[in-house]
Curated annotation (Swiss-Prot):
Gene that produces this protein: pdxT
Organism of origin: Geobacillus thermodenitrificans (strain NG80-2)
EC id: 4.3.3.6, 3.5.1.2
Cellular component annotations (GO), alphabetically ordered: cytosol; glutaminase complex
Family, per entry: Belongs to the glutaminase PdxT/SNO family.
A Gene Ontology BP annotation from the UniProt entry: glutamine catabolic process
The protein, known as: Pyridoxal 5'-phosphate synthase subunit PdxT
Chain segments annotated as transmembrane: none
Function of the molecule: Catalyzes the hydrolysis of glutamine to glutamate and ammonia as part of the biosynthesis of pyridoxal 5'-phosphate. The resulting ammonia molecule is channeled to the active site of PdxS.
NCBIfam families documented for this protein: PLP_synth_Pdx2
Binding residues annotated for L-glutamine, in chain numbering: 46-48, 105, 133-134
Top-level division of the source organism's lineage: Bacteria
UniProt-listed InterPro entries: Class_I_gatase-like, PdxT/SNO, PdxT/SNO_CS
Subunit architecture: In the presence of PdxS, forms a dodecamer of heterodimers. Only shows activity in the heterodimer.
Amino acid sequence: MKIGVLGLQGAVQEHVRAIEACGAEAVVVKKTEQLTGLDGLVLPGGESTTMRRLIDRYGLMEPLKQFAADGKPMFGTCAGLILLAKRIVGYDEPHLGLMDITVERNSFGRQRESFEAELSIKGVGDGFVGVFIRAPHIVEVGDEVEVLATYNDRIVAARQGQFLGCSFHPELTDDHRLMRYFLNMVKEAKTVSSI
């Protein structure tokens, strides 16, 4: 199983290590042609507006949308969640606009720029430590979206079909259960596409 990590900016190597720790092959994606042959893609945390500029500069917007249209799973963490969202509070247009959610950037306030919280994640388990760094949260979800985790009544993880998104940085701990959950999504998608 080959998983790409969008390597334009952000916590790229940490995701590579998490993918490899789960027994899959990781590929850092910086060019369009590197999307070929991938089974899934991680959109890492970083700074969403910088990532968007780089996506545009390297001509990755349409290839990423095509990757999604081909039914391949995508996992967005922190800034990656913002890239996936169809709606962003205070912005007229989304980035990739693939997941039927509304997100608010930096929504935990400056006093809480960075913190850790123990989460219970549906399909993953309890006692998962979420590392939040200038994190967004999901304000609203569409009918097809399943809420997987909340923190202080805010949605911090959700899934819609082939798309998985979370507000926190799962790659910054040694608990790889959420990455395993994503890899299972990728396995399921591969099974369906080969039928």
